[in-house]
């Protein structure tokens, strides 16, 4: 399993989720999709160029403080080596596997996947509300198996065909 994850501080805490602070807007469906698309496009461009400075500059101040461009190069090395084309995620709407929620005041978690073939892309993204904008605060991207992303089919055996009477 390939993963790119940063930073631990942005991961979901053990405490139950808190409601969003009143000054933090709750994004609508289109805004949620745009956050995911823009993040994956930025990561794809960084992987192509081997330069993560723009991705870092687009992120939250806490993310920037914890990750310089060299560290991000290391963090995303396995994803880059997999040559997974994240630009294909721009062709589909993300499928959310969990309801987008606030895991800390001002920290929004989005979890889901893109049902691409042959390799779906799973994501877990964290955003922080900073100066009137959502900024990347944490990221995990993994290639996923198709079977793990599709709803389980019924395990009932097929009915035997009726017997013909002569």
Task: Please annotate each region the language model reported.
Residues 4-34, 80, 143-166:
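Compositionally biased, proline/threonine/alanine/serine-rich low-complexity intrinsically disordered stretches
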Residues 6-7, 51, 121:
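Generic detector of short, well-ordered, non-transmembrane alpha-helical segments enriched
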Residues 26-38, 45, 49-107:
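Short solvent-exposed beta->alpha transition segments
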Residues 42-45, 124-125:
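Alpha-helical interaction segments
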Residues 43, 64, 86, 137-141, ...:
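Localized chelating/binding microdomains
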Residues 94-166:
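Exposed beta-sheet edge and beta->alpha loop/turn motif
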């Amino acid at each position: 399993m390939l993963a790119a994850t940063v930073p631990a501080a942005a991961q979901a805490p053990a405490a139950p989720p808190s409601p969003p602070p009143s000054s933090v807007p709750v994004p609508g469906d289109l805004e949620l999709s745009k956050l995911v698309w823009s993040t994956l496009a930025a990561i794809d461009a960084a992987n192509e160029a081997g330069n993560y400075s723009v991705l870092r500059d687009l992120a939250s101040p806490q993310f920037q403080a914890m990750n310089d461009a060299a560290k991000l190069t290391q963090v995303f090395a396995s994803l880059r080596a997999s040559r997974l084309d994240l630009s294909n995620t721009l062709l589909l709407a993300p499928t959310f596997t969990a309801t987008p929620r606030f895991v800390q005041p001002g920290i929004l978690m989005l979890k889901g996947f893109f049902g691409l073939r042959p390799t779906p892309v799973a994501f877990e993204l964290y955003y922080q509300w900073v100066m009137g904008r959502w900024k990347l605060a944490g990221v995990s991207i993994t290639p996923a198996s198709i079977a793990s992303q599709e709803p389980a089919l019924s395990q009932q055996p097929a009915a035997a065909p009726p017997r013909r009477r002569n």
